[in-house]
Amino acid sequence: MGSRFLLALFLILLVLGCEVQAAQQLQQDDPGSSALLDKVQESISSYWDTAKAAAQDLYQKTYLTSVDEKLRDMYSKSSAAMTTYASIFTDQILTLLKGE
């Protein structure tokens, strides 16, 4: 599973790198590329809004009170644990830096 994750991460980074390189070439070639960029941003924004609305509709259709309570309880417990561990880690770093 770790190799699949790394492969997926590599492919995502490769695609993003190609997109950035293509965007830079478009800006260098065409001074009116801001209009194209605006169209792409609007398109991505509309796709995102559509996906978000679909996810919210699906959530509302499958909403269960008991599951929601369990999720809230799990979130509060995990955030409390993370706060504790973060403060311990910070204390250890400060102790290491002070040299006590």
Swiss-Prot record:
Residues in the signal sequence: 1-22
Keywords associated with the record: Chylomicron, HDL, LDL, Lipid degradation, Lipid metabolism, Lipid transport, Secreted, Signal, Transport, VLDL
GO BP annotation list: lipid catabolic process; lipid transport; positive regulation of phospholipid catabolic process
GO cellular component annotations of the record: chylomicron; high-density lipoprotein particle; low-density lipoprotein particle; very-low-density lipoprotein particle
Region of interest (Lipid binding), residue spans: 66-74
Domain of life: Eukaryota
GO molecular function: phospholipase activator activity; phospholipase binding
InterPro entries cross-referenced by the UniProt entry: Apo-CII (IPR008019), ApoC-II_dom_sf (IPR023121)
Localization: Secreted
PTMs per UniProt: Proapolipoprotein C-II is synthesized as a sialic acid containing glycoprotein which is subsequently desialylated prior to its proteolytic processing. Proapolipoprotein C-II, the major form found in plasma undergoes proteolytic cleavage of its N-terminal hexapeptide to generate the mature form apolipoprotein C-II, which occurs as the minor form in plasma.
Stretch list, region Lipoprotein lipase cofactor: 78-100
Pfam family, one: Apo-CII
Function: Component of chylomicrons, very low-density lipoproteins (VLDL), low-density lipoproteins (LDL), and high-density lipoproteins (HDL) in plasma. Plays an important role in lipoprotein metabolism as an activator of lipoprotein lipase.
Family classification: Belongs to the apolipoprotein C2 family.
Protein name (record): Apolipoprotein C-II
Organism per entry: Microtus ochrogaster (Prairie vole)
